[in-house]
């Protein structure tokens, strides 16, 4: 009886360990991720609006869940120093996301912005936050 209980407990602990590892989305510190500020899913802020932003570079992806009082996706990301760039004639030209730099003039790389899987027709600085929508910034190198 004791042996059976110990076996069951050992199996349960092993399963818990496996599920815990699987639920931790952590990216290795290689390639463009070498300079990344965060390499695992993170939560930020305490505002009334929720913004979910996926950051994809190379084959890796992390998700940021941001609670904010801001109205735009860009302001929510800037509030937590998750993006930076240059103001241009079409709005904010994002050069850095999560510490990862993309500069088209240097190596033909840039950050593409998606709203629920569709390429965005607006920039992050003008895109209003919509609850339940997933936004994505993807590192693209031509």
Model-inferred region functions:
Residues 2-13, 18-142:
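Ubiquitin-like/PB1-type beta-grasp interaction modules and other compact soluble beta-rich domains
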């Amino acid at each position: 009886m004791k042996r059976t209980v110990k076996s069951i407990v050992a199996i349960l602990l092993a399963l818990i360990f496996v599920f815990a590892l699987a639920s931790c989305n952590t990216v290795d510190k290689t390639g463009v991720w070498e300079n990344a500020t965060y390499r695992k899913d993170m939560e930020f802020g305490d505002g009334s609006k929720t913004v979910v932003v996926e950051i994809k570079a190379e084959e890796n992806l992390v998700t940021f869940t941001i609670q904010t009082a801001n109205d735009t996706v860009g302001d929510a990301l800037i509030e937590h120093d998750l993006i930076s760039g240059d103001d241009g004639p079409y709005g904010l030209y994002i050069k850095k996301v999560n510490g990862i730099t993309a500069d088209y003039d240097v190596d033909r790389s840039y950050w593409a912005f998606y709203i629920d899987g569709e390429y965005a027709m607006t920039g992050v600085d003008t895109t209003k936050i919509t609850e339940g929508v997933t936004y994505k910034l993807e590192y693209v190198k031509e």
